[in-house]
Regions:
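Conserved PRPP/pyrophosphate-binding segment of the phosphoribosyltransferase/PRPP-pathway fold
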Residues: 1-83, 92-132
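Active-site glycine-centered loops adjacent to acidic/histidine catalytic or metal-binding residues
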Residues: 86
Length: 132
């Protein structure tokens, strides 16, 4: 199953489109038979804009904020799910979506994204790498 990460309704209204959904639909058109688009995830509540949040704050912001819609739970159970996103920054959204899919019994969950932001190198990280 190709499972796009959910776009917040407010973001969809503001932009007028759903780029992650569009990406997943385009990907599904190029897949062999048996691989299906499954817009199975939804937000359970509003979340703060993630743009200025650090890794820990992003994870806390998203904790419990994504679930599998009832109508998709049977389909997801036991299935291999490919999460689709446009950009991965810290991985917090992918982690929360993975948690939601596994909670209803997804078989395997993997992630696919068009781009990823580079990790910020902090003095502590540099010191840790030098010590290794």
């Amino acid at each position: 199953l190709l499972v796009p990460l959910p776009t917040a309704r407010s973001s969809r209204r503001r932009r007028g489109d759903d780029p992650v959904g569009d990406l997943a639909r385009a990907g599904a058109r190029g897949c062999p038979p048996g691989i299906h688009l499954a817009p199975a995830l939804r937000h359970t509540r509003r979340v703060a804009d993630q743009a200025r949040l650090d890794r820990g704050a992003r994870a806390a912001n998203l904790a419990g904020a994504i679930e599998v819609s009832r109508r998709w739970r049977q389909v997801v159970r036991g299935s291999t799910c490919v999460l689709v996103d446009d950009v991965v920054t810290t991985g917090a959204t992918m982690a929360e979506a993975t948690r939601a899919l596994r909670a209803v019994g997804a078989g395997h969950v993997v992630a696919a994204a068009v781009a990823a932001t580079p990790r910020r190198v902090t003095p502590a990280l540099v010191a840790h790498r030098v010590a290794d």
